[in-house]
């Protein structure tokens, strides 16, 4: 604890500020170039599906048209920011795959064409394009397409205010806050070489990279080179660095701004954007960063040294994120000293040495001009971090694991990311290795396409809508997780959405009409749309008494005002008084009023209407199993429910099949039970109603059905003035034109699920989430 600030550490401990200290704001900005299947830089334009890159909040371009930049919002936890970068990676990967492209998982470039063929990003602001053109003249395009990750960090304001109160300093709050971040930035500059060693992941480069650098390196395989003992080419003089090491003071904001302004005035750099220091001071809400810093102060720190980690599917591991968090805490608790020009010279020297020679067993770093073995100094820093954790965060397993893993890498360079990459690339080849990973990661995303990572508790339709919003750069906010209530903003207006399809576009009365099946039928009938005949009841005894009216009819018994097929019983054939009474009781469990109506012949189809369009049409096949001649129905259901597409609570494309009263009664009417053993290949239905919510299968019929039925669906939606609704229609023959007696509307749904149209059991994704966004924002 020799060089830790014992006074500050004591105050945080004595005043029980640990819980405030560990809370922070986190953000990530991640770059990847797009590549073809052969590992060549993709020369295609930025995908149109991502909309205007300058307005998209999450998906932009960096230097090159081929270089994507993914930006998370400010997140409250590392788990949250990690989940968000997972979702961005998935959204981007699944979109560019349509053009046969992949995200290149390495900071160093793939197979590059000639300099002049690398496309600069096409932007609306000519100054932004000119800035990039000047970079290409100065550094070369091949260096500019090196990619990496920026890690944005700030403490919660409440922690800084509590610390300000406890320390009783004689300065105003803004100055105190700025001093905290300046202190951290200075210590970061001094010790960041350790992060390069621990996270460096760009030791090898392709033969198509810069010719002069190849001459400095050694051949590793048929298509690649490396600098012996290097950890991060990107952080070295051969990578993404300024031409010179510029001295910029971090002793005050005024000195910081003045030094950078002088670099611009002397034409050393074009603007602060070209100041490629491993850490930069950042202020919110202004185009002119330096003026904003001077007038508003520091809001957060931007860490710029992270390589893409090819061994992590997201390009960065949780371990690295927790390491950085602990390191930022460490920089505040280290001694508070101003740094001189001579200090910075030493920091630059250590930076370059670790980037190019860090894996050498005898590697040294310099401290006050004295060489010290890297491994010895690394252990000392990690020991201090361990003391901090033991004093303040003794129950934090993530921090403890980070220190343990870091020590392993310090003690054995073979455990570093860079060493592992060299070994794997030597065995497989530079392009083959990275393309294998790129394809593996894409397949992983494809297998979990419908999930919004970190938000799996939301209904699947809501998850899909948010994923589509992310693709367009429409910002979202979860307002009530249990209710699936979100807000969406495109920067110009805000839309509130509940359960994916309840929006401002439909009035309250429209929802009430569709909620009430009796009123819905009356309105449709008034508009000359065929609906089933029947009666409504609000008294269970009256309903049971009328058994004699229906006993020879095919009927449906259902609640008047429920969704998702709850409480519905269907009798297409003979049924007993006991079965009838039980169905009436089941319906009354779900509502105070029920309907008993004729059962219409034909197959049932769900039409999804959004705006003036029928977006998708599904036939929902009732819950069923296919026999194998050995297993019981109960066992077959259990096996079918193991499908990863099946789950509970509308969080997967298909719902698990239930074995309840309704299923038992339906099987009984077929002379079967849960213990019956169907023949090999025999299909057994467990329900008459075909809702996905009760275990049904979804089969897309959008392009197979006669267009006249789409007109009927649109007419039905217009009759109740609905812009979003599900129309349940029974049709005798889908190839035959709609006529008076060959179809009928059995229900309108005011909150239709969209996931069944996006991930049908059979058929194509109808992009219902995108259609909702079109309705809300176009």
Swiss-Prot record:
Record region (Glutamate--cysteine ligase): 1-354
PANTHER family assigned to the protein according to its UniProt record, in alphabetical order: GLUTAMATE--CYSTEINE LIGASE (PTHR38761:SF1)
Pathway named in the protein's UniProt entry: Sulfur metabolism; glutathione biosynthesis; glutathione from L-cysteine and L-glutamate: step 1/2; Sulfur metabolism; glutathione biosynthesis; glutathione from L-cysteine and L-glutamate: step 2/2
Chain coiled-coil ranges: none
Cofactor: Mg(2+); Mn(2+)
Domain ATP-grasp, chain residue ranges per copy: 521-777
Tree of life domain: Bacteria
Chain sites annotated for binding Mn(2+) 2: 747, 749
Signal peptide annotation: none
GO molecular function: ATP binding; glutamate-cysteine ligase activity; glutathione synthase activity; metal ion binding
Cellular component aspect of the GO annotation: cytosol
Enzyme class: ligase
NCBIfam families: glu_cys_lig_rel, PRK02471.1
Protein name as annotated: Glutathione biosynthesis bifunctional protein GshAB
Documented EC number(s): 6.3.2.2, 6.3.2.3
């Amino acid at each position: 604890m020799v060089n830790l600030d014992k006074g500050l550490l004591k105050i945080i401990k004595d005043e029980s500020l640990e819980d405030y200290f560990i809370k922070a704001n986190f953000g990530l900005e991640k770059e990847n170039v797009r590549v073809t299947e052969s590992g060549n830089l993709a020369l295609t334009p930025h995908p149109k599906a991502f909309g205007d890159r300058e307005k998209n909040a999450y998906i932009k371009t960096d230097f090159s048209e081929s270089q994507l930049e993914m930006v998370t919002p400010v997140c409250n936890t590392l788990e949250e920011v990690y989940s968000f970068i997972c979702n961005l990676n998935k959204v981007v990967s699944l979109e560019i795959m349509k053009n046969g492209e992949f995200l290149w998982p390495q900071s160093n470039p793939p197979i590059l064409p000639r300099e002049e063929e690398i496309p600069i990003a096409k932007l609306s602001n000519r100054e932004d394009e000119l800035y990039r053109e000047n970079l290409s003249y100065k550094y070369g395009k091949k260096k500019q397409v090196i990619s990496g990750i920026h890690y944005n960090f700030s403490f919660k304001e409440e922690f800084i205010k509590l610390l300000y109160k406890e320390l009783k300093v004689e300065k105003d709050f803004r100055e105190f806050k700025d001093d905290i971040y300046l202190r951290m930035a200075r210590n970061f500059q001094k010790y960041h070489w350790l992060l390069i060693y621990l996270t460096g992941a760009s030791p090898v480069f392709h033969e198509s990279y810069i010719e002069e650098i190849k001459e400095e390196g050694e051949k590793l395989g048929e298509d690649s080179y490396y600098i012996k003992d290097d950890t991060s080419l990107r952080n070295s003089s051969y990578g993404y660095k300024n031409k010179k090491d510029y001295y910029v003071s971090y002793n005050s904001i005024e000195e910081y701004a003045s030094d950078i302004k002088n670099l611009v005035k002397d034409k050393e750099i074009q603007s602060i954007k070209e100041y490629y220091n491993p850490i930069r001071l950042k202020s919110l809400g202004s185009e002119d960063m330096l003026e904003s810093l001077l007038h508003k102060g520091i809001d957060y720190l931007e860490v710029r040294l992270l390589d893409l980690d090819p061994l992590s599917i997201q390009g960065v591991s949780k371990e690295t994120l927790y390491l950085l968090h602990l390191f930022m805490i460490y920089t505040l608790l280290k001694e508070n000293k101003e740094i001189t020009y001579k200090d910075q010279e030493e920091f630059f020297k250590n930076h370059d040495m670790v980037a190019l020679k860090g894996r050498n067993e005898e590697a040294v770093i310099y401290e006050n001009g004295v060489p010290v073995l890297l491994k010895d100094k690394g252990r000392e820093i990690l020991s201090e971090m361990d003391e901090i954790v033991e004093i303040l965060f003794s129950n934090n397993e993530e921090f403890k694991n980070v220190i343990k893993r870091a020590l392993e890498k310090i003690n054995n360079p073979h455990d570093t990311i860079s060493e592992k990459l060299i070994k794997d690339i030597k065995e497989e080849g530079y392009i083959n290795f990275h393309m294998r990973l790129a394809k593996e990661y894409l397949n992983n995303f494809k297998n979990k396409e419908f999930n919004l990572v970190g938000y799996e508790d939301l209904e699947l339709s809501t998850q899909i809508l948010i994923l589509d919003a992310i693709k367009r750069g429409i910002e979202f906010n979860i307002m009530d997780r249990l209710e699936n209530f979100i807000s969406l903003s495109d920067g110009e207006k805000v839309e509130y959405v509940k359960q994916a399809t309840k929006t401002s576009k439909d009035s309250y009365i429209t929802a009430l009409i569709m909620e009430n099946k009796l009123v819905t039928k009356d309105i449709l009938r008034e508009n000359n749309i065929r609906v089933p005949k029947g009666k409504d009841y609000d008294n269970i005894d009256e309903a049971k008494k009328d058994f004699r009216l229906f006993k020879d009819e095919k009927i449906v018994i259902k609640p008047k005002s429920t969704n998702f097929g709850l409480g519905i019983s269907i009798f297409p054939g003979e049924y007993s008084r006991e079965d009838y009474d039980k169905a009436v009781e089941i319906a009354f469990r779900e509502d105070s009023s029920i309907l008993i109506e004729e059962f219409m012949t034909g197959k049932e189809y769900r039409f999804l209407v959004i705006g003036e369009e029928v977006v998708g049409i599904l036939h929902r096949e009732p819950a069923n199993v296919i026999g194998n001649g050995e297993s019981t129905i109960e066992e077959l259901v259990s096996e079918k429910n193991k499908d990863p597409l099946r789950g509970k609570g509308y969080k997967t494309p298909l719902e698990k099949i239930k074995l309840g009263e309704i299923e038992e009664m339906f099987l009984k009417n077929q002379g079967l039970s849960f213990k019956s053993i169907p023949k090999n290949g025999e299909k057994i239905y467990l329900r008459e109603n075909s809702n996905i919510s009760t275990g049904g299968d979804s089969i897309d019929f959008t392009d197979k059905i006669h267009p006249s039925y789409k007109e009927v669906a649109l007419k039905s939606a217009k009759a109740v003035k609905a812009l979003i609704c599900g129309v349940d229609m029974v049709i005798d023959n889908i190839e035959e034109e709609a006529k008076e007696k060959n179809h009928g509307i059995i229900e309108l749904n005011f909150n239709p699920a969209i996931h069944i149209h996006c991930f049908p059991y059979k058929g194509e994704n109808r992009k219902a989430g995108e259609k909702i966004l079109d309705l809300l924002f176009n």
